Amino acid sequence: MRNTEKQDNLVRAFKSLLKEERFGSQGEIVDALKHEGFESINQSKVSRMLTKFGAVRTRNAKMEMVYCLPAELGVPTVSSSLRELVLDIDHNNALVVIHTGPGAAQLIARLLDSLGKSEGILGVVAGDDTIFITPTLSVTTKQLFDSVCELFEYAG
């Protein structure tokens, strides 16, 4: 079997496993892939694949924190229904804070991270349902707040 075939098979198996929404740790994913015949897989490779495919940790139907893939792979766009996941946007003198639905913060943060410094975003930190955004020196927190509100069509 060629390397590209092996890689394609690994990617298919990886995506299939994540669709099951039952893996709470990278170690569990490694074990499942080894069980499917990918003996050379390790935690480092799984970590890179999770990042590459935009996997996030969210709660499944049993309320367990598990890895899953966003519906559309790659960097999400504002034209997707992400704006519906934003519940509240606020700011103070230092940060812009976004509150999202449960498990949605990492997906929204990924979009914001992709915009980067060109939009005045120095950094983004996301939890399960809360995102902190720090502006660059060239942008005030109020300007960043207004920009983020416009991005998600948030009227407050």
Curated annotation (Swiss-Prot):
One GO BP: regulation of arginine biosynthetic process
GO cellular component: cytoplasm
Transmembrane segments: none
Compartments in which it is found: Cytoplasm
Pfam hit, one: Arg_repressor
InterPro entries: Arg_repress, Arg_repress_C, Arg_repress_C_sf, Arg_repress_DNA-bd, WH-like_DNA-bd_sf, WH_DNA-bd_sf
Major site of localization recorded for this protein: cytoplasm
Keyword set, alphabetical order: Amino-acid biosynthesis, Arginine biosynthesis, Cytoplasm, DNA-binding, Repressor, Transcription, Transcription regulation
Pathways per UniProt: Amino-acid biosynthesis; L-arginine biosynthesis [regulation]
Domain of life assignment: Bacteria
GO molecular function ontology, one term from the record: arginine binding
NCBIfam families given in the database record: argR_whole, PRK05066.1
Protein task: Regulates arginine biosynthesis genes.
Family: Belongs to the ArgR family.
Protein name: Arginine repressor
Species of the source: Vibrio atlanticus (strain LGP32)
